[in-house]
Swiss-Prot record:
GO terms for molecular function: enzyme activator activity; single-stranded DNA binding. The keyword DNA repair applies. This is Single-stranded DNA-binding protein. PANTHER family: SINGLE-STRANDED DNA-BINDING PROTEIN. It comes from Bradyrhizobium diazoefficiens (strain JCM 10833 / BCRC 13528 / IAM 13628 / NBRC 14792 / USDA 110). Residues 54-60 bind DNA.
Length: 164
């Protein structure tokens, strides 16, 4: 293989409102905590079990930070695409620590609100090919959706059925 791939795709719910902070030169950084869950039936008891995994997500893309700040709230369902990165840092007592995070930065990052604004549809935000590096706007995604303008309930045909 000529190269390698570092791509993470998550669909989950925000565990808390996004934390927005700014660099010294004023650029925003958004931190998200996303929960993904899997459920199964225990073979012995027949009892339904669930395991939740928590993921740290850091957004360095200014446009995506604005979307996170304005529209994302605790409990919101999101689809994200980013890269897995591990960083090393030293805590206050001098102990070296490591954090592994999903990073949304640059061109290969996507943030899609699956709940939509106001409950209907969803909105997709990411880097448009050939666009400005820091800009972000609605882009087409696999299930083509426009940014929701608000209102409306969930579509009944959007259940868990796969269209093929």
């Amino acid at each position: 293989m000529a190269g390698s791939v570092n791509k993470v795709i998550l669909v989950g719910n925000l565990g808390k409102d996004p934390e927005i902070r700014r660099t010294q030169d004023g650029r925003p950084i958004a931190n998200l905590s996303i929960a993904t869950s899997e459920t199964w039936r225990d073979k012995n008891s027949g009892e339904r079990k669930e395991k939740t995994e928590w993921h740290r997500v850091v957004i360095f893309n200014e446009g995506l930070c604005k979307v996170a700040e304005q529209y994302l709230k605790k409990g919101a369902k999101v689809y994200i695409e980013g890269a897995l990165q591990t960083r090393k840092w030293t805590d206050q007592s001098g102990v070296e620590k490591y954090s592994t995070e999903v990073v949304l930065q640059g061109f290969n990052s996507t943030l899609t609100m699956l709940d939509g604004r106001g409950g209907g549809g969803g909105g997709s935000f990411g880097e448009e090919p050939g666009g400005d590096f820091g800009s972000s706007g609605p882009v087409s995604s696999a299930p083509r959706r426009a940014v929701a303008a608000g209102g409306g309930g969930r579509n009944s045909d959007m259940d868990d059925d796969i269209p093929f």
